[in-house]
A protein has these predicted regions:
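Low-complexity, intrinsically disordered short peptide segments enriched in small/polar/basic residues
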Residues: 8, 17, 40-43
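A glycine-centered beta-loop-beta connector
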Residues: 27-30, 35-50, 91, 99-114
Length: 142
């Protein structure tokens, strides 16, 4: 199965100059946990709800902080013709739950572990990826 068969095609995109408040509002509106950051149609970053919580709110910054200050630049991306198994491996290796899908340098979709897990044939792959992504860091709180 290819990513184009399961990817979400209706996706929001932010500019690096947008605020984290706008990012949070879009996440709420689209009911998602991450939004790609684009310059024209090219993906230059990704911002997640976790980025906002840890890199903005937890350090006392307000909602007017620019997305570029908290986003992950140059995110890992997939392509529409990538096999789902390859995407799961890529997500596992990079410990990411969401993968922007790019074709000819343009954002065309998004795939999450949730998209993969709802496909009956792919549930085991999604479970494996989630286990790998969710491994706790050793002695994180000691």
């Amino acid at each position: 199965m290819k990513l184009k068969d399961i990817m979400s095609r209706e996706i929001a995109c932010l500019s690096a100059e947008d605020t984290v408040e706008k990012a949070a509002q879009l996440m709420k509106s689209y009911n998602v946990g991450s939004i790609p950051v684009c310059a024209q149609d090219s993906v230059v970053g990704i911002i997640t709800d976790r980025d906002i919580a840890l890199r903005a709110i937890a350090v006392g910054d307000d909602g007017y902080l620019q997305v570029k200050k908290v986003m992950t630049a140059n995110p890992v991306v997939g392509t529409p013709d990538m096999d789902v198994d390859d995407a799961v491996r890529l997500m596992s290796e990079n410990q990411i739950r969401r993968l922007p899908i790019v074709e000819n340098n343009s954002l065309v979709g998004m795939v999450s572990l949730g998209d993969i897990s709802v496909e009956p044939k792919l549930q085991e792959d999604a479970e494996t990826a989630l286990k790998n992504i969710s491994k706790p860091a050793a002695n994180r709180f000691s």
